[in-house]
């Protein structure tokens, strides 16, 4: 942040809750400096209490920002300005002295692995936005912990925001309030500054009573200074700064420096009928079913899946060499459309109370509605779309925004893992990569080695989704499902992953790749998915146990004939599901080669190049 005077005399904001004197010195300096800059009317230091939460909700209801959903217990609906509905990659930047610290310099064109901004350009952008940006509003001070308070893997942040929606959502998504300040003491914290960019009095009327400033939106990360600065958007991924900004972009950089991993992964526990349990982590791009897998009800008798987290994993090898993982979040910020009793019954149970919905449709009896909810409507019940218009099922436009969300406490999930808040984390024995591939990629394969597994992660591709602003059904590269979230140069990130193999005593997890989404020539899915995916997890479980249930192919190990339990499944065309076509894979390798050469260029680690050449070689001999 540009230099500020920290004399504490130049702001007249009235502290309406908490006291500046009670803050640790560095936190106080951070608050006062930014109060002076942003000029809020009031300062509210959040305590995280139930009572405070109730007041915030009542205040937002009064302002018309949220409505109560009378069908459920303490559930609320926010409708945003239609210009503020998703993460905006084009306005999300990382500021470092050298461009190459943030992204590899591509062979041609622009980097797709992050956006760099120079310190000078950022200073200009900052000074054009923040002075006076909170006039007439309250600056909320949110002390929050990513990870269970007191866990050696947890990290603390302080977010300053002028949005009560952010405060309410952060109370669900993180551990937040006075207890965090007590745990922090004089320790280090990540500085997070957020403003909707609408000082009062307003220059122009709000849409849906939703404050945002789309023309000037900017989400900036300053990893060297441990700062996140976000302006102009109230939407979750841009404003709940603990989520992608801190837990992935800043944390991945901390992880590189400190020798751990911050990843876009779910964490689940799977227990076999004998009561033996293993934990797996899985990286899929947004909207490829991370939440559904993390909360799965297995169809296999006697198997059990429990959820540790559905989106982000922080992982570190312990002294015994086990890779230990925590979920740094405290809630789920899930995509609503497609969530139903059939696709994710546990998510449906989780969101019945204490949940904030954003940009879903509302039924006239005070319920929520979205595409794929699969709920019959009672006679006479009508639907109001996310655009606040009456909606009928035959309408062209969707009733809920494709990236509409539920924000709900993780503790309410009926299958939350008993160890989900364990301070030391859970031991990860398998890592799964996957994406949405309609053609060519088999249901499951296992990497040949750690190095090959890292290459498989680097080569991930998937059909584009709604969580970003891209449109259309293109197959996009999304290495490690981290493409929008890398906090530093992807070439260096690959080197960091590869370096895990050289850790003394490290028990490296097996690495797998899955594709639930392969289709036949009529465009029908070849695999039923959802709870049936437990059959694939069962095979992985056996492989981790050392079962001889795999055969070698040019792309990796696949299940031997009859090694995948298909008992009770209807017609599944196993040959088509596992078919590996030379022609397809020659093209695939070409694509991967071109992408890595162009995008990672001089920063591509030699081991990845070697894996690519070896794969080419194996395919050419098919």
Swiss-Prot record:
What up-regulates or down-regulates this gene?
A: Regulated by cAMP, dexamethasone, glucagon and by insulin. Dexamthasone, glucagon and cAMP increase levels, insulin decreases levels.
Phosphothreonine (modified residue): where? 178
The EC number of this protein is 4.1.1.32, 2.7.11.-
> What's the PTM story here?
Acetylated. Lysine acetylation by p300/EP300 is increased on high glucose conditions and promotes ubiquitination by UBR5; acetylation is enhanced in the presence of BAG6. Deacetylated by SIRT2. Deacetylation of Lys-91 is carried out by SIRT1 and depends on PCK1 phosphorylation levels. Phosphorylated in a GSK3B-mediated pathway; phosphorylation affects the efficiency of SIRT1-mediated deacetylation, and regulates PCK1 ubiquitination and degradation. Phosphorylation at Ser-90 by AKT1 reduces the binding affinity to oxaloacetate and promotes the protein kinase activity: phosphorylated PCK1 translocates to the endoplasmic reticulum, where it phosphorylates INSIG1 and INSIG2.
Positions of the UniProt region annotated as Omega-loop: 457-487
Which Gene3D superfamilies does UniProt cross-reference here?
3.90.228.20, Phosphoenolpyruvate Carboxykinase, domain 1, Phosphoenolpyruvate Carboxykinase, domain 2
Q: Which UniProt keywords apply?
A: Acetylation, Cytoplasm, Decarboxylase, Endoplasmic reticulum, Gluconeogenesis, GTP-binding, Kinase, Lyase, Manganese, Metal-binding, Nucleotide-binding, Phosphoprotein, Transferase, Ubl conjugation
Activity regulation, short description: Phosphoenolpyruvate carboxykinase activity is regulated by acetylation and glucose levels. The anaplerotic conversion of phosphoenolpyruvate to oxaloacetate is improved by PCK1 acetylation on Lys-91 (K91ac), Lys-473 (K473ac) and Lys-521 (K521ac). High glucose concentrations favor PCK1 anaplerotic activity by triggering acetylation on Lys-91 (K91ac). At low glucose levels, SIRT1-mediated deacetylation of Lys-91 promotes the cataplerotic conversion of oxaloacetate to phosphoenolpyruvate. Phosphoenolpyruvate carboxykinase activity is inhibited by 3-mercaptopicolinate.
* Details of cofactor binding: Binds 1 Mn(2+) ion per subunit.
**Gene Ontology molecular function, alphabetical:** carboxylic acid binding; GDP binding; GTP binding; magnesium ion binding; manganese ion binding; nucleoside diphosphate kinase activity; phosphoenolpyruvate carboxykinase (GTP) activity; phosphoenolpyruvate carboxykinase activity
On this chain, the residues bearing N6-acetyllysine are 70-71, 91, 473, 521, 524, 594
Q: Name one GO cellular component term.
A: mitochondrion
Please give the name of this protein: Phosphoenolpyruvate carboxykinase, cytosolic [GTP]
Subunit structure, per the record? Monomer.
- SUPFAM superfamilies recorded for this chain? PEP carboxykinase N-terminal domain (SSF68923), PEP carboxykinase-like (SSF53795)
What GO terms in the biological process aspect are recorded for it? cellular hyperosmotic response; cellular hyperosmotic salinity response; cellular hypotonic response; cellular hypotonic salinity response; cellular response to cAMP; cellular response to dexamethasone stimulus; cellular response to fructose stimulus; cellular response to glucagon stimulus
Name the gene behind this protein: Pck1
Is Metal-binding there in the keyword field? yes
Pathway membership, UniProt: Carbohydrate biosynthesis; gluconeogenesis
Q: What is the originating organism of this protein?
A: Rattus norvegicus
Q: Which cofactor does it need?
A: Mn(2+)
Chain residues that bind Mn(2+): 244, 264, 311
């Amino acid at each position: 942040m540009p230099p500020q005077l920290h004399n504490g005399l130049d702001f007249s904001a009235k502290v309406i809750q908490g006291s500046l004197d009670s803050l640790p010195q560095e936190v106080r300096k951070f608050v006062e400096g930014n109060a002076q800059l942003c000029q809020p009317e009031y300062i509210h230091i959040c305590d995280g209490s139930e009572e405070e939460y109730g007041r915030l909700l009542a205040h937002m209801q009064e302002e018309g920002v949220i409505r109560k959903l009378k069908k459920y217990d303490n559930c609320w609906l926010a409708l945003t300005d239609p210009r503020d509905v998703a993460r905006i990659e084009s306005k999300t930047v990382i500021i470092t002295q050298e461009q190459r610290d943030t992204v590899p310099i591509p062979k041609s064109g622009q980097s797709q692995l992050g956006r760099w901004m120079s310190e000078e350009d950022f200073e200009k952008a900052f000074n054009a936005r923040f002075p006076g940006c909170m006039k007439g509003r309250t600056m909320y001070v949110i002390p929050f912990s990513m990870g269970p308070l007191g866990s050696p893997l947890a990290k603390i942040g302080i977010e300053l925001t002028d949005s009560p929606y952010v405060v309410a959502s952060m109370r669900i998504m993180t551990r937040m309030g006075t207890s965090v300040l007590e745990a922090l003491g004089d320790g280090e914290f990540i500085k997070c500054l957020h403003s909707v960019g609408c000082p009062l009095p307003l220059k122009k009327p709000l849409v849906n009573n939703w404050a945002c400033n789309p023309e000037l939106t900017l989400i900036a990360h300053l990893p060297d200074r441990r700062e996140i600065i976000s302006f102009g958007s109230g939407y979750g991924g841009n404003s709940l700064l603990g989520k992608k900004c801190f837990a992935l972009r800043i944390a991945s950089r901390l992880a590189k420096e400190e020798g751990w991993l911050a990843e876009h992964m779910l964490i689940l526990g799977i227990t076999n009928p004998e009561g033996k349990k293993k934990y797996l982590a899985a990286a899929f791009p947004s909207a490829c079913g991370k939440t559904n897998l993390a909360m799965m009800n297995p169809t296999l008798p006697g198997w059990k899946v429990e959820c540790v987290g559905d989106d982000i994993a922080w992982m570190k090898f312990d002294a015994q060499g086990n890779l230990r993982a925590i979920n740094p979040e405290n809630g789920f910020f899930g995509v609503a459309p497609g969530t139903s009793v059939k696709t994710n019954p546990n998510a449906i149970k989780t969101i019945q109370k204490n949940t904030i919905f954003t940009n879903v449709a509302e039924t006239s009896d005070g319920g929520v509605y979205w595409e794929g909810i699969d709920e019959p409507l009672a006679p006479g019940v009508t639907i109001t779309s996310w655009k606040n218009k009456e909606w009928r099922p035959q309408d062209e436009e969707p009733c809920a925004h494709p990236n509409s969300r539920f924000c709900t406490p993780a503790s309410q999930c009926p299958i939350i893992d008993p160890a989900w808040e364990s301070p030391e984390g859970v031991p990860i024995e398998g890592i799964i990569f996957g994406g949405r591939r309609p053609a060519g990629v088999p249901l499951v394969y296992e990497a040949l080695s750690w190095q090959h597994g890292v290459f498989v992660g680097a080569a991930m591709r998937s059909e584009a989704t709604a969580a970003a602003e891209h449109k259309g059904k293109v197959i996009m590269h999304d290495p490690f499902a981290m493409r929008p979230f890398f906090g530093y140069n992807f070439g260096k990130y690959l080197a960091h992953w590869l370096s895990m193999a050289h850790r003394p005593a490290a028990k490296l997890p097996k690495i797998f790749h899955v594709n639930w989404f392969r289709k036949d020539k009529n465009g029908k899915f070849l695999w039923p998915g959802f709870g049936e995916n437990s059959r694939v997890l069962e095979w992985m479980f056996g492989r981790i146990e050392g079962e001889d249930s795999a055969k070698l192919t040019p792309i990796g190990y696949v299940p031997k004939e009859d090694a995948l339990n298909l008992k009770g499944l209807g017609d599944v065309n196993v040959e088509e599901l596992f078919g590996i076509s030379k022609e397809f894979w020659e093209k695939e390798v070409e694509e991967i080669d071109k992408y890595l050469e162009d995008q990672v260029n001089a920063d591509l680690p030699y081991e990845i190049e070697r894996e690519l050449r070896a794969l080419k070689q194996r395919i050419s001999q098919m």
